[in-house]
């Protein structure tokens, strides 16, 4: 069994490419996961699709075959050639895949280092795949350790001491271009976590905030929680020409603000499009200042410089957590093998005991004593060997040892991990 992660992120792909690779709703995500798992060598998969990344994390029996299947599937859906996808993607397998997963969960791979949204997005992606039967024990183990690693990073470093997000960075950008936002009318489109954070930051800065959404009662609920006002989505065509400030982060697959509804204004407008695919597509409007996710990089770089020390410490934690994860996986392989060795030895002792009794070498009335004695002999003989097997599970040569023992006891390696329940998998689900 192998782990494989194919990653398209803000580090290797343009916004245009990420838009084409994005999956905006549950229906599309389910279709993608179904096609992923239809690959001959892929047995479990998780799809992570956010404004800054699209990643496939899977377990597979053959890395080359699984990689080929994933690229063919993504190319067919997105219209981006396989050559371009291969040129852009970061491909991680086995230990590097786990290391990358832990980095993503700990927000070390985020555009905004230390942002807290990615952990929730990762949990949502895992739950969706798990609840719909697209992943099970193999990925659940990795995800559980990823969340544990993220918690260690948060507790041991200061990278999340001042929580930041793309939304808070966008509001910071607004403040850098506008001297004062107090009293200015600001429209927030959408009701997701990013919209909520944006609305709260704008309100705390004194802006007059309105929230709108296709589903009005959701806008009313968020506005009530934040202390904002509600704007009917049907009035969006008026609002874009009346409001000075606009933030949008919807899950629409098509732009919702286009040339058709934009009119000339005698004041500057500041629009922030944090959606992928983008919500705004226009070709006119001289006094419109539009910022998309990738335009926030300057502030992000400043954020990174503030958190460099914490990030270095976090990388060390992630490295150690990766090693500990594979040591733990090795113990899952070792214990079943030790159990099977004992079972085979006891069965051989039982057969031999019955044989000598049947031949009359030992009286029948001593049968129980013979069984106990033979088992005690075997336990004494196997104890030292099993102790060494357990101790070596934390060493680099563990893989060689487990392969050799699997060969000797004629056990299929693919059977072993799934035979033993991961006690953490249910905890992840129950801890939602």
Swiss-Prot record:
One GO BP annotation of this record: protoporphyrinogen IX biosynthetic process from glutamate
Active site: residue positions: 51 (nucleophile)
Important for activity (site feature) positions: 100
Binding site for NADP(+): 190-195
Catalyses which reaction(s): (S)-4-amino-5-oxopentanoate + tRNA(Glu) + NADP(+) = L-glutamyl-tRNA(Glu) + NADPH + H(+)
Top-level EC class as recorded in UniProt: oxidoreductase
Subunit structure: Homodimer.
Note: During catalysis, the active site Cys acts as a nucleophile attacking the alpha-carbonyl group of tRNA-bound glutamate with the formation of a thioester intermediate between enzyme and glutamate, and the concomitant release of tRNA(Glu). The thioester intermediate is finally reduced by direct hydride transfer from NADPH, to form the product GSA.
Name of the protein: Glutamyl-tRNA reductase
UniProt gene name: hemA
């Amino acid at each position: 069994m192998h782990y494989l992660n194919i990653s398209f992120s803000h580090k290797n792909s343009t916004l245009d490419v990420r838009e084409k690779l994005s999956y905006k709703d549950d229906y599309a995500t389910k279709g993608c996961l179904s096609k992923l798992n239809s690959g001959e060598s892929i047995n479990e998969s998780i799809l992570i699709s956010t404004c800054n990344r699209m990643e496939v994390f899977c377990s597979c029996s053959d890395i080359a075959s699984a990689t080929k299947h994933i690229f063919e599937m993504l190319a067919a859906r997105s219209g981006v050639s396989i050559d371009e996808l291969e040129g852009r993607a970061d491909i991680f397998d086995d230990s590097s895949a786990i290391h990358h997963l832990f980095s993503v969960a700990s927000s070390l791979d985020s555009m905004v280092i230390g942002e807290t949204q990615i952990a929730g997005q990762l949990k949502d992606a895992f739950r969706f795949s798990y609840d719909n039967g697209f992943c099970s024990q193999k990925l659940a183990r990795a995800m559980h350790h990823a969340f544990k690693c993220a918690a260690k990073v948060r507790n041991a470093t200061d990278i999340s001491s001042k929580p930041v997000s793309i939304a808070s960075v966008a509001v910071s950008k607004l403040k850098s271009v506008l001297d004062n936002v107090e009293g200015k009318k600001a429209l927030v489109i959408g009701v997701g976590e990013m919209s909520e954070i944006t609305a709260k930051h704008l309100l705390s800065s004194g802006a007059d905030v309105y929230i709108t959404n296709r589903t009005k009662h959701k806008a009313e609920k968020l506005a009530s929680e934040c202390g904002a006002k509600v704007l009917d989505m049907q009035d969006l065509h008026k609002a874009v020409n009346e409001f000075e400030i606009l933030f949008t982060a919807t899950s629409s697959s098509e732009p919702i603000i286009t040339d058709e509804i934009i009119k000339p204004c005698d004041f500057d407008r500041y629009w922030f499009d944090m959606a992928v695919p983008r919500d705004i597509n226009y070709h006119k409007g001289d006094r419109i200042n539009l910022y998309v996710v990738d335009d926030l990089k300057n502030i992000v770089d400043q954020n990174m410089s503030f958190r460099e020390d914490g990030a270095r410490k976090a990388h060390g934690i992630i490295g150690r957590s990766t090693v500990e994860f594979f040591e733990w996986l090795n113990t899952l392989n070792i214990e079943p093998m030790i159990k099977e060795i004992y079972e085979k030895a006891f069965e051989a002792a039982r057969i031999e005991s019955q044989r000598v009794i049947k031949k009359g070498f030992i009286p029948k009335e001593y049968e129980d004593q013979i069984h106990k004695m033979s088992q005690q002999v075997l336990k004494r003989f196997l104890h030292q060997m099993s102790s060494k097997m357990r101790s070596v599970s934390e060493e680099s040569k563990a893989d060689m040892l487990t392969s050799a023992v699997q060969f000797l006891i004629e056990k299929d390696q693919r059977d072993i991990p799934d035979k033993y329940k991961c006690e953490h998998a249910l905890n992840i689900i129950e801890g939602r």
